[in-house]
Amino acid sequence: MDYRSAGVDIDLGQAFVRGIRERVERIQVPSSGSSETLGGIGGFAGLFELPTGYQAPVLVAGTDGVGTKLDIAQQWGQHQGVGVDLVAMCANDVLTVGARPLFFLDYVATGKLEPEALWQVIDGILAGCQEAGCQLLGGETAEMPGFYPPGKYDLAGFCIGIVEKTAILDGSRVQLGDRLLALPSSGLHSNGYSLVRRIVADRGWRWDHRPPGWDRPLAEVFLTPTRIYVQAVQRLQAAGIAIHGMAHITGGGIPENLPRCLAPNQAARLQPHSWPIPQEFLWLQEQGQVETLEMFRTFNLGVGYVLVIPPEAENQVRSLLPEAFPIGEVVAACPGESRVLGLEQWGSLTSPAD
């Protein structure tokens, strides 16, 4: 008896790591100034030289996964997008405090190492790192026979960024009257998929079905990778825009995430129907008979990221980022009331309340 007969192929695992190292060496990740990786993939630990030019540098850490979106990818046989998702979920979180992503680590767990699928995942991770401007510094691939069913894997990611201590965005800069500008999502991103899968299954749909008016099957629409907002935010930072706060709209939607970038005594007042809800969300609401407030608490509804900026900066931001659109403003919070106001005025997602 040996380890391979128990389900763990050490030789295949080592070959997989060598392949990752070769891919990393071939791909030129955008330079992060004077910082660089020291050594390479495959050691006991990854080494990264911090960039110079900071007076009081603060490291920022974020970790996340992709959730049950992985189940759709595994059924459909398309895995690269979830690699991008993994980086996006972590890098976008790190970005919210004003940090610049520096490096990323991944954790892949599977019952049996299947290189064809996992290479797609790794290629997606590398593509995400390129877009976020960070380095893939290392990771872990765990083969766990008997723990995961055949063809199944799980992912976790870890992103480290850096920010000047005096530039940290922690809610203290936000002022009453600040504008809320949204950056559009690319779709569902990586949240709400347990409900998506339940709706699809209960209504008798298959992932290869195309609802009326759709130009792609359900699986392709719902596997659209999460958008990475690093370059958009860095464009504003380079222009000297005074960003007062940022929110990454993930699990819990706008109601749970937008208040996280505000001061405790502040609330966000949304302008009802200030943006068109993408068709996939309308379809989910109709198919699942989901109440509007529950839709807001589960999905991003087309808003992937929110910028909190002073009123005088709004025109410049919209000039630099034409895709940005206004959704509301910062107001004083009332004790005991919601910190996101205006949701009750939406009624349905397609028409104002009566």
Curated annotation (Swiss-Prot):
Disulphides: none
Keyword Ligase: yes
Subcellular location: Cytoplasm
InterPro entries documented for this protein: PurM-like_C_dom, PurM-like_C_sf, PurM-like_N, PurM-like_N_sf, PurM_cligase
Gene Ontology molecular function, alphabetical: ATP binding; phosphoribosylamine-glycine ligase activity; phosphoribosylformylglycinamidine cyclo-ligase activity
Enzyme class: ligase
GO biological process: 'de novo' IMP biosynthetic process; adenine biosynthetic process
Entry's Gene Ontology cellular component terms: cytosol
EC number: 6.3.3.1
Pathway field: Purine metabolism; IMP biosynthesis via de novo pathway; 5-amino-1-(5-phospho-D-ribosyl)imidazole from N(2)-formyl-N(1)-(5-phospho-D-ribosyl)glycinamide: step 2/2
Highest taxon, organism lineage: Bacteria
Annotated catalysed reactions: 2-formamido-N(1)-(5-O-phospho-beta-D-ribosyl)acetamidine + ATP = 5-amino-1-(5-phospho-beta-D-ribosyl)imidazole + ADP + phosphate + H(+)
UniProt keyword list: ATP-binding, Cytoplasm, Ligase, Nucleotide-binding, Purine biosynthesis
Record Pfam families: AIRS, AIRS_C
NCBIfam families named among the record's database cross-references: purM
The family this protein is said to belong to: Belongs to the AIR synthase family.
Protein name: Phosphoribosylformylglycinamidine cyclo-ligase
The organism of origin for this protein: Synechococcus sp. (strain JA-2-3B'a(2-13)) (Cyanobacteria bacterium Yellowstone B-Prime)
